[in-house]
A protein has these predicted regions:
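Nucleotide-activated sugar donor-binding and catalytic core shared by glycosyltransferases
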Residues: 1-386
Length: 386
């Protein structure tokens, strides 16, 4: 059996790696091909191309990358045609994934087509849910409220759970990490998480670093740790090397988890990482900044109250969101001071909210990758009967 997986960014790479492990547990002879990052490659898949090429985001920033992306779509479709897998599973990155699925349909390549991680139609285009059945045979979602948007439109959809509940961060032991970098017990670790895309780092890291400089003056015992990924490591390293505050840049997943388990606070780009921080009770804020034209378009096209997943899932403002003009040194500094104060209302609100979030996500109860693997194998079996 050959499973063809396509993950276009680091979060999808981690999700894909967990799915691969779960599939191998159920069928040790299973083979993999496709597109992914270092985590999926560790599980035995040789990526067709470097996913760094797809690490783009933002309506205005995408245009220069269009020729490269179109070339990769053609390469992917040709590879699927040649390898003849039992299933093609795209993971997140719907913009790229949709084009691959449409091209496979157009070329009439007979293969089961699935997508893992529903596009956020409730935030963007609800009409998109009405047409997805034309391009994929089955959809796997992370949140329990999502199937209702797709099932009425002829698309078999299954809620499998969010991968954050399986995160190794939950059981990480920081001891080895602290010893390796000789971080003394009297130091308080604070995480700086500017995102995994080049444009995110360019937009967020400068203001995060400005805040860190001021924060260090107020709290000399703070020790800053900046987890990043290899796709943006050089840019991050260049940006922090001249700063007065000592900032430890780390790139491995294990060290990121260990650092988070010992952190007293964090500032983060909105995304899955913020959900992980909430799961392990790290006080944090989310901040995001994009070019003005992108921000204008997003505000016109979206219909949501929050950008942070914790706030969206609980439907109330638990985690502070500092967006666009609010993403400045002064507001970051003021909010972080509250995060570092266990007696502040913000600190108490977050801790109570995080407890409720764990219940909503089924932490300790659900195993999303196992459920996803079961559905994939069942879908292949059903498809082969046709």
């Amino acid at each position: 059996m050959l499973v063809y997986l396509i993950a276009g960014e680091p979060s999808g790479d981690m999700l894909g790696a967990r799915l691969m492990r779960a599939l191998k547990e159920k069928n040790p002879k299973i083979k993999f091909a496709g597109v992914g990052g270092e985590n999926m490659e560790k599980e035995g898949m040789k990526s067709l191309f470097d996913i760094t090429d797809l690490a783009i985001m933002g309506l205005a920033e995408v245009i220069p990358s269009i020729p490269k992306v179109l070339r990769h779509i053609r390469e992917t479709v040709d590879d699927v045609k040649e390898k003849k897998p039992d299933v093609v599973i795209t993971i997140d990155s719907w913009s790229f994934s949709a084009r691959v699925h449409k091209a496979l349909r157009k070329k009439k390549i007979k293969v089961l087509q699935m997508h893992y991680v529903a596009p956020q139609v409730w935030a963007w285009k609800k009409r998109r849910a009405k047409t997805m059945y034309k391009y994929i045979d089955r959809l796997l979602t992370l949140f329990p409220n999502e199937p209702q948007y797709f099932i009425p439109h002829h698309l078999p959809t299954d809620f499998v759970g969010h991968p954050v509940v399986e995160s190794s961060m939950i059981n990480a032991d920081p001891k080895e990490f602290l010893e390796k970098y000789q971080i003394s017990p009297d130091k308080k670790i604070m995480l700086i998480l500017p995102g995994s895309r080049h444009n995110e780092v360019a937009n967020l890291l400068p203001v995060f670093l400005e805040m860190a400089e001021e924060l260090k003056k107020l709290y000399p015992d703070l020790f800053f740790v900046l987890p990043t990924v290899k796709t943006v490591k050089q840019r991050v390293t260049d940006m922090v090397k001249d700063k007065q505050s000592d900032i430890l840049v780390i790139t491995t997943q294990a060290e990121r988890y260990a650092a988070a388990k010992s952190a007293v606070a964090a500032v983060a780009a909105s995304g899955t990482v913020a959900l992980e921080l909430a799961i392990v009770n790290v006080p944090h804020l989310v901040a995001y900044k994009v070019p003005p034209i992108t921000a204008w378009l997003v505000r016109r096209l979206t219909h949501i109250k929050y950008v942070n997943l914790t706030n969206l899932l609980l439907d109330r403002p638990i985690v502070p969101e500092l967006l666009q003009e609010d993403c400045n040194k002064e507001k970051l500094l003021a909010t972080t001071k509250d995060l570092l104060n266990s007696k502040s209302e913000l600190y108490k609100t977050e801790q109570k909210g995080f407890e409720n979030l764990r219940k909503v996500l089924g932490v300790g109860v659900m195993r999303p990758s196992q459920k996803a693997a079961e559905i994939v194998l069942e879908a292949i079996k059903e498809y082969n009967k046709k």
